[in-house]
């Protein structure tokens, strides 16, 4: 059935949702008003790969292919379905974070400045470009309003392709431990990661960027819930306290902020639902990646595996919808968009490398502080560049959120000093 007829059916079932914030109003027939419909179509495209793949995995396992299989396909099936048991001689232990005796305090300070600058520049640029791409028009003139880029899935694909290339080159050029995880297990983290990224980009059509940043900061709560369900973790009292403070701060910001121009209760609700979807999918991704690290792979190998399936899912879904060519044509019509999308992908991939290097050199606590400050700077930068307003109560709510995040870092450090096992920091393998 033609996509326009599907649009008519869904419009009859759901109220029309206009683009929120400062974005131009979309025409009635535009699918940007039907985010739920696009989500279902995308998910169906991913299922067309996941379901046959799952059935094949179950078939090979029931057939005991590891014992009976032979031929040219055996190594491929073994790697994808069963994995490889790492041998002691094959393991390449990742170097622990140690401070060399000859390293001077000045050199350490310069390295910290390099890491902090790299993270801030990468992710602040990424945030500014993300808001520009999803909320502004391209090709606008005095007589024409231009056109907006609306396909969030195409943007996810561009990010993942460059990240896959960077991870692949890192695996080839740098010595890695022998890979032991079955490849199919990456597909679950990849699916949730693609869906979380899609929700993140799509939400910017309905809510402001500062609201999105605070929503990301509040994902500590669903991460803890997912940790209980997926990893059976237990948490300290201070973690529940800081999670409550974050909830209070976010509530202060959301309840005190006035509506953006052209927004409505329907668009705001759509944005909040998409942000909730982002947080839920991202929380699952983090906990699934933590479980996968039991196979002793490196962070770069994890990055490669997740992005490989992300590219497979998004390319397949875009081809099924006929949207891959349209996204490419949009890039051809608007060179500015092509430059923005490329720079967005570069910032994402470089940010990943800075994450790995910073944690390796200074630990997760320093990394968390840098990224917390980055979120605060991102809100300030967005308000300056795109004219978002924040009330006094909203500003206090933002302060409460970031104070709670820094309190979590301090509490983790105290636990480490006392020799207690601190709750691991959220997996940083895929941030965007």
Swiss-Prot record:
GO molecular function, one term: antiporter activity
Positions of modified residues (Phosphoserine): 427
Catalysed reactions, as listed in the record: 3'-phosphoadenylyl sulfate(in) + adenosine 3',5'-bisphosphate(out) = 3'-phosphoadenylyl sulfate(out) + adenosine 3',5'-bisphosphate(in)
Transmembrane residue ranges: 5-25, 40-60, 109-129, 154-174, 238-258, 265-285, 299-319, 353-373, 387-407
Keyword flag Transmembrane helix: yes
GO cellular component terms listed in the entry, alphabetical order: endoplasmic reticulum membrane; Golgi apparatus; Golgi membrane; membrane; trans-Golgi network
Keywords: Antiport, Golgi apparatus, Leukodystrophy, Membrane, Phosphoprotein, Transmembrane, Transmembrane helix, Transport
Location of the protein in the cell: Golgi apparatus membrane
Membrane-related topology note: Multi-pass membrane protein
Tissues expressing the protein: Highly expressed in the placenta, pancreas, mammary gland and skeletal muscle. Weakly or not expressed in colon, heart and prostate. Expressed in the brain, predominantly in frontal lobe gray matter, subcortical frontal white matter and cerebellum.
Superkingdom of origin: Eukaryota
Gene Ontology biological process terms, A to Z: 3'-phosphoadenosine 5'-phosphosulfate transport; 5'-adenylyl sulfate transmembrane transport; chondroitin sulfate proteoglycan biosynthetic process; positive regulation of canonical NF-kappaB signal transduction; transmembrane transport
Associated disorder: Leukodystrophy, hypomyelinating, 26, with chondrodysplasia: A form of hypomyelinating leukodystrophy, a group of heterogeneous disorders characterized by persistent deficit of myelin observed on brain imaging. HLD26 is an autosomal recessive form characterized by severe psychomotor delay, limited or absent speech, abnormal development of brain white matter, corpus callosum hypoplasia, and cerebral atrophy. Other features include pre- and postnatal growth retardation, chondrodysplasia, and early-onset scoliosis.
Function: Probably functions as a 3'-phosphoadenylyl sulfate:adenosine 3',5'-bisphosphate antiporter at the Golgi membranes. Mediates the transport from the cytosol into the lumen of the Golgi of 3'-phosphoadenylyl sulfate/adenosine 3'-phospho 5'-phosphosulfate (PAPS), a universal sulfuryl donor for sulfation events that take place in that compartment.
PANTHER family linked to this entry: ADENOSINE 3'-PHOSPHO 5'-PHOSPHOSULFATE TRANSPORTER 1 (PTHR10778:SF13), SOLUTE CARRIER FAMILY 35 MEMBER B (PTHR10778)
Family assignment from sequence similarity: Belongs to the nucleotide-sugar transporter family. SLC35B subfamily.
Protein name (Swiss-Prot/TrEMBL): Adenosine 3'-phospho 5'-phosphosulfate transporter 1
Organism listed in the record: Homo sapiens
Originating gene: SLC35B2
């Amino acid at each position: 059935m033609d996509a326009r007829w599907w649009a008519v059916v869904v419009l009859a079932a759901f109220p029309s949702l206009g683009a929120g914030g400062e974005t131009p109003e979309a025409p009635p027939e535009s699918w940007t008003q039907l985010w739920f419909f696009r989500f279902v179509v995308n998910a169906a495209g991913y299922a067309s790969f996941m379901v046959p793949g799952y059935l094949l995995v179950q078939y090979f396992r029931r057939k005991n292919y590891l014992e009976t299989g032979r031929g040219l396909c055996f190594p491929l099936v073994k790697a994808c379905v069963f994995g490889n048991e790492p041998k002691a001689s094959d393991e390449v232990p990742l170097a622990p974070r140690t401070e060399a005796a000859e390293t001077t305090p000045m050199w350490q300070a310069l390295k910290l400045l390099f890491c902090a600058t790299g993270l801030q520049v990468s992710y602040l640029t990424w945030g500014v470009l993300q808001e520009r791409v999803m909320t502004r028009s391209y090709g606008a003139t005095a007589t024409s309003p231009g056109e907006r880029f609306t396909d969030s899935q195409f943007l996810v694909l561009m990010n993942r392709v460059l990240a896959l290339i960077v991870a692949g080159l890192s695996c080839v050029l740098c010595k890695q431990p022998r890979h032991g995880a079955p490849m199919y297990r990456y597909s679950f983290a990849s699916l949730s990661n693609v869906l979380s990224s899609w929700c993140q980009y799509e939400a910017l059509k309905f809510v402001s960027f500062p609201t999105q940043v605070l929503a990301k900061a509040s994902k500590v709560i669903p991460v803890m819930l997912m940790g209980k369900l997926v990893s059976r973790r237990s948490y300290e009292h201070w973690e529940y306290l800081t999670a409550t403070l974050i909830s209070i701060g976010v509530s202060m910001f959301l309840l005190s902020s006035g509506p953006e121009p052209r927004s409505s209760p329907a668009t705001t609700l759509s944005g909040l639902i998409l942000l909730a979807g982002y947080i839920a999918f991202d929380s699952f991704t983090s906990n699934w990646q933590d479980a996968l690290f039991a196979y002793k792979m490196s962070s770069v190998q994890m990055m490669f595996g997740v992005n490989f399936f992300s590219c497979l899912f998004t390319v397949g879904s875009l081809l099924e919808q006929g949207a891959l060519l349209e996204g490419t044509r949009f890039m051809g019509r608007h060179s500015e968009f092509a430059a923005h999308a490329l720079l967005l992908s570069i910032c994402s991939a470089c940010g990943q490398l800075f994450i790995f290097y910073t944690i390796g050199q200074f630990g997760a606590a320093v990394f968390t502080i840098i990224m917390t400050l980055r979120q605060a700077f991102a809100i300030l930068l967005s308000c300056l560049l795109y004219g978002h307003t924040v009330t006094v109560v909203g500003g206090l709510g933002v302060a409460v959120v970031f104070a709670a995040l820094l309190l979590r870092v301090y509490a983790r450090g105290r636990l480490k000093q006392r020799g207690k096992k601190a709750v691991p920091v959220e997996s940083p393998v895929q941030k965007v």
